[in-house]
Each structure stands twice: as structure tokens, then as C-alpha cells.
């Protein structure tokens, strides 16, 4: 009887206990952004890094933004160490709040970190292993110090991290490349593929997000930049979609055309590994949003000329990007290798180790670019003919 009573009491104690690992919400430091900078390169492959965490300021959350004594919606805490894990531990000594990463939105890594072979992988590995992190955290490279971006005070958001997160989310509709996310980078690291990462910078006290860094897959070291125009070409090749605009010249005047739909198809047309050749076709649809000049846009002749101008400009943009990536960087961030791997796997097995390294078949291949542009609307009041009728 005593044993049964003791057993009942022990079972009851389990239900009476609280959460052993419980941390009260007021003791949590909600980290929404993290910046990693290189402070010093040491010998024996060691580096001193600066880790900056951006925490939400709970006091500011309850203060009206128009109040005279309104506080910043965030606070930044920085520590340096040779180990990011150790730096994270140090962080706890600088605040009474326990860093909580489940609401992390963005990770910013400076170009200086990516300039060192393998360092970017080591940095990201710390975040990949963090069980609190969601796999959709966005990763950006910064032109200068990463923690400087976290000091930017946005007008419409409480924190620069949340502003950058929303800027990236809206980027798809603005014709910008989608950011890399942790789960995607983890897969890239495993297969040692060359890749690009969107870059952000501060210009005239504004965050600018319009170009990318190109990274060698074998050692995860940055090799160069694609500027804003080259990045648009990259977008047409790798991530065509709706959104964004392109400017064309018609009748001596500028025309802005919004992208309503864009698709790209890449095919391997010559399977001789010493003379690999691809065809790349971009199908572009757009509507004219802005036009300066007196030309009548409703005539068939005008539309044909505008479409021809668009085709010429897009083709030039795409070819310039291919030229830079193929001949200067010699790294396949354009996903041509994916076309061979998917459609011609037997061939891929014979060249994979020398695709964009060694013999570098990628840099030796040729690409024939074709663009077909179709204007589907000249504006709200000038709906034009259906494509089928124009083709008659």
C-alpha cells in the first residue's frame, strides 16, 4: 500500500513541476538581425570576428512613434572573438537578456569575411547548427562593415533588420533577385556549387539592394561583383518573373515598360564536351507604364519598333552578364550546368569535375541568346490588340 501511495505521489509531482528550461518572456532578448565583420586576420588560419546582434527594444514597442521622446525600436550589441560560439556566450554578459534567435530575420556578412577562403562557410555553419533558427532566414553580403547596416534608422519600420526583410520580400515585385536563405546555402555548400549572394550597401543614407557578389563554390571565396545592370541580366537568366521595369528608347524618347511576365528556356544544342553550345531564349511580356514624347503608341508600326528595341536591350544585357561570368569569373552561377545534369546526365558525369574548375568546360562553351518581346498593353486607356490577332 505504501509503495502504491509513493508511486502516485511521484507521478503527481511530474504534473506539478514547471517547465525546467523555461525562460520568462521579459528575460528574452529577441534577436532580429545579426551582422558578422572581420576585425583581424591572424596566423594559422585564425580570425578575430565581430558579432553584432540587433535586439528589439521592448520599451520602444510601447512608445507611440510620434511621441516627443520616442525611442529607437532596437539596440545593437557587439562582441569580438575568434569563435562566434564564444562571442554569443560573451553577449550574455553584456545584457540581462538571453539572446533568442527564433525571430531572426536577416544575417549580414561583410565582403571582408567572404574575401577569406572558407571563412564564410565556417560562419554560416554556426547558424546552420543553431536549432532555434528558422531555415528561411535571409542572408546578405554588405559592401562595407555589416554592422553599419544595423545602425540605419528606417522611417517606416521599428528596426533596420525588419526593414531589410520586407524590402527583400517586396523585391520580387520590384524585379530584384530573391535573397539566399540558410537552407539554400546549406545545400550549396554540400555540393560545392558556385553561387551568388545579393549585396546591400548604404548610399545617401538609404539601403540599396541591387547587385550581387559571385562566390567560388570550391572554397566559398568571393571573386567579384555583378553590378546593377549585370544583375538584371542575371535575373533574366536564372529567375525570370513578373515585376520590375526596363527602359527602352523609342523615337528618340524614353519608354518605361513594366514586366508582366518573363520566362527563360535553356537548351544544350551541342553535346561535344570540347565544343558545348547552349541556346537561351527569353520570352518577355510587358506593359508600357511611362512614355515621354508625342508618338502614337497604338499603331502596329510603333509596337513592332518598341518590341524590337526591348529585344535588343534585353539581349545586350543578358549577353553582357554571360560574358562577365564566363570569361572573367569563369564560374557557373547561371545554372547552365543544371541543364546538362537534368537533361543529359551521362554527359554530366564525364564533365562535372571540370565544369567550372580544372578544364573549365563552362568558360569554353558558347551561348546563343534570343529574345522575344511582346507588349500586351500601352496603358490603362490604350488596351491593344491580342497577340493572336497581331500575328495574323
Question: What is the meaning of each model-derived region?
Answer:
Residues 2, 10-392:
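Membrane-proximal alpha-helical signals and transmembrane carboxylates
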